[in-house]
Amino acid sequence: MEVLEEDLTCPICCSLFDDPRVLPCSHNFCKKCLDGVLEENSRTMQWRPSSFKCPTCRKETPTMGVNGLQVNYLLKGIVEKYNKIKVSPKMPVCKEHSDQPLNIFCSTDLKLICGSCATTGEHKKHVFSSIGDAYIQEKSSLETLFQGVEEWNSKEVHSHLDTLESNKRKALHSLAKESDKVKAYFEKLQYLLEQKKNEILSDFETLKLAVMQAYDTEINKLHTVLSEQRKACNIVEDLKNISDPFMFLQQMQEFRDKMTFIKEAPLTTGQDVNVNPAMKEFDTSMWDSIKLGEVDKLSLPQDTTSKKEPGDAKTLHSLKPILVVACLILLLVTFLCAYPFIDSLPTFTIDLQVISSYFFTTTAKAANLTILFWEQLSEELLILKQRCQTYVSVFLENVAEFVCKYKL
């Protein structure tokens, strides 16, 4: 049909021929298309053209008006028949026998078949009907089938449908709850990982502080020695220009003091200060074997070469309030009791001398003995004060080291 339509198409308007006219060169065009060609020619030329060229072959054709051209009745009739065929519905064809129209109705199987199916196929011994008779028969059968559809009980289907939709909602709700659980699990895991990361990085900061404390002390000592050495060199340069004997001798004394300090200053060995020897073998790949539920076990390696430490971290954390309170009490006792009492002993001795003189005016010897006793007691208490200060300092240093070591 498409190939036929190409032959029935006007070359100018590319549509099916409408009142086709044939030129002397045998080419066909629509009447209205030729009118347009002639009108265009008359506009472009100052005088009336005596001929025009065929739009297809460019052959000259005498101008005698489109109405004077011969109508191609044969082509016009073919176009009209083609339009009727094109508008009419197409007859279905057989799927098993290509291009064979389904023009026979098998009354046995109640289906359309082609001639080949009726003679050679599985329908060979079936009962056949014409298309018209089959149409009437199936039309009456439609009413019977429609009544069966109306009488069909759909309540059971609706019941099953409601059950399925209810089960679907329950399943989706259950999946949503499980999805929320999974989301909460990973959010918790993410929180634990972030918390553990911050804890381990905090441990690294503690190690950095320990390294800085270990190295900075020795570095500062060496800087001090170098500074004193530069000062000593400056003193030597100044001594070369001093002519005053007294000033020279005074500067020489300062120079000898600095030289003594420089020579007696202890020099470090320059070796590495390993704060945590276990960190030498530290590798994050050792955490790969830890399960998700055991994220809390992630930690930096601990130094096992030091003194034995308490193993229960919870016990250490529980002692934190007690240690803090003990330190506060010790400081309070030290500063509120020791210092005011001991520092006031000399004044107390003088007051005691006055009181003794008042009560023992008749016995000067007893007063002198009493004053001597309290002077000796004051000396002993002053010695006790110094020792207490030393013990308190040592105790506070040990407490600070303990707190830093176990991160209380």
Swiss-Prot record:
Entry-linked InterPro entries: TRIM45/56/19-like, Znf-RING_euk, Znf_B-box, Znf_RING, Znf_RING/FYVE/PHD, Znf_RING_CS
Main localization category: endoplasmic reticulum
Key words, A-Z: Endoplasmic reticulum, Ligase, Membrane, Metal-binding, Transmembrane, Transmembrane helix, Ubl conjugation pathway, Zinc, Zinc-finger
Zn finger intervals (RING-type): 10-58
Topology versus the membrane: Single-pass membrane protein
Gene Ontology BP, a term: protein ubiquitination
GO molecular function, a single term: ligase activity
PROSITE patterns: ZF_BBOX, ZF_RING_1, ZF_RING_2
Start-end of B box-type zinc fingers: 89-131
Pathway(s) the chain acts in: Protein modification; protein ubiquitination
The keyword Transmembrane helix is assigned to this record: yes
Key word Cytoplasm present: no
Transmembrane segments: 322-342
Binding site for Zn(2+): 94, 97, 117, 123
Compartmental location: Endoplasmic reticulum membrane
Cellular component terms (Gene Ontology): endoplasmic reticulum membrane
Domain text: The C-terminal transmembrane domain is indispensable for the localization to the ER.
Role this protein plays: E3 ubiquitin ligase involved in the retrotranslocation and turnover of membrane and secretory proteins from the ER through a set of processes named ER-associated degradation (ERAD). This process acts on misfolded proteins as well as in the regulated degradation of correctly folded proteins.
Protein name: Tripartite motif containing 13
